Amino acid sequence: MNTTHGALSALILAGTRPGAPDPMAQACGVSHKAILPVGGTPMVLRVIRALQATPGIGRIAVCIDNPAVLDGLLPSDIEIVPSSPNGPSASVLAGLTQMGTPLLVTTADNALLRPEWISEFLAKCSPQTDVAAAVAPEAVVLRDVPGTRRTFIRLADMAFSGCNLFLFRTPASLQVAALWQRVEKNRKHPLRIAWLLGPGILLRAVCKKLTRAALCKRIGALSGTTAELVPLSDGRAAVDVDKPADLELTEKLIAADAAAKT
């Protein structure tokens, strides 16, 4: 995807999920995981700086339920989008409504995010796609972050971990966010999700015959869009801060990177 300077907006999801408080926030004594310090810097600020350093990105907004927790942290030009109590998918829909497309979406716990990863993702996105998600192939993750424990989705032709980086390129991509919302509502009911995706997809997944192309095609068919998974070349892009071990790993990687630059 080619972007002229300032043509692409970016949204950072930083709200709390409905229900129980985030365990990482509780463990670290903060109200929101987004403000948890990583290497001495609040996570959300690390993400903002990565976006600001990426060519082609203009407007940047943080989507959060209580903006007061960010007082004194954000640069003056960062916008606020109120998050939805109905979960991340509804918050993305709110962001799309306020900011329009194309919209790059990431999360505040994506503390390792780098401008070069964002640029690689955007460059690899097909100009025909409505929505794209960045992924890190398993082999790349294990090469770059040996010993890490990540969740991998296994397809017939690819095993990958998500990178919390999405591009909603066209207005049609709102339909994918709406589909995501339907899946999210049924996240505690696997059979309902399986029914939503269709028995053919489920059968191929169980038999380990579901390919990347077939999965994207099905998502596209359900939402009336074109969708794609975009592999990144750095396995560290799959690391986010979901648990204490992730925080330790993230700070270790940041320290190693800083040492390599001296």
Predicted regions and their residues:
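N-terminal nucleotide-binding beta1-loop-alpha1 segment
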Residues: 1-29
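Short catalytic helix/loop segments, enriched in acidic residues and glycine
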Residues: 27-45
